Design a protein with these regions (language model features):
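Small-residue-enriched alpha-helical segments and adjacent helix-cap loops
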Residues: 6-143, 154, 158, 162-165, ...
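A structural-propensity feature for long, helix-poor, extended segments
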Residues: 147-149
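Membrane-embedded hairpin module used as a gating/binding unit in multi-pass transport
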Residues: 170-174
């Protein structure tokens, strides 16, 4: 996206996580291809600023080769915030994996449409900007909830992917 100081490249780390090596790579790429300035967005993304149009293909290749950007476009476009401290074997992590795996089947969504996955006992993302929240309710059931709604739809891990797709199709048709 073009900004006043050149292109702006938005990086959406998969599972809202970066390794220290990836963070160092982003800093290096920001200096190499951009103006050295980065921003952190409200949706847990990083933005590298000041890129020249001619440097964009090299930057994208470097991001993909280092595992920071996904070579699979639908997965890379997914706006997903995963609660901090979510462990890789947890329900929240598996729900995030299900969303990444289903990304090709998603209907056309607005560019800022996003998910917040907050399945722990503490709500870390209650104020995070998103359209669909995935949570565990007080009885321990998996819940899909439209942002701003008190009530949600109870689902299971087995039905999660199909229930999310149904919710997304409802969203775009309404």
């Amino acid at each position: 996206m073009m900004s006043g100081d050149g292109l702006l490249v938005r990086i959406k780390p998969a599972f809202s996580r970066l390794t220290s090596r990836q963070a160092q790579m982003i800093a290096l790429l920001s200096k190499r291809h951009g103006n050295g300035f980065m921003d952190i967005t409200n949706r847990a993304n990083l933005q590298i600023r000041g890129l020249k149009q001619s440097d964009y293909p090299l930057m994208l290749k470097d991001l993909q080769d280092s595992g920071i950007a996904d070579k699979h476009e639908a997965r890379d476009r997914l706006n997903l915030i995963l609660a901090p401290f979510t462990e890789s074997q947890s329900v929240g992590w598996r729900c995030a994996e299900a969303l990444y795996n289903a990304a090709d089947a998603f209907p056309a969504l607005p560019s800022k449409f996003g998910f917040a996955i907050d399945c722990g006992t503490t709500r870390y993302l209650q104020h995070a900007s998103c359209d669909i929240r995935v949570e565990i309710d007080e009885t321990g059931q998996l819940l899909i909830r439209l942002d701003g709604c008190e009530q949600g739809y109870v689902t299971s891990e087995e039905k999660f992917q199909s229930d999310i797709l149904q919710a997304l199709h409802w969203f775009v048709s309404s």
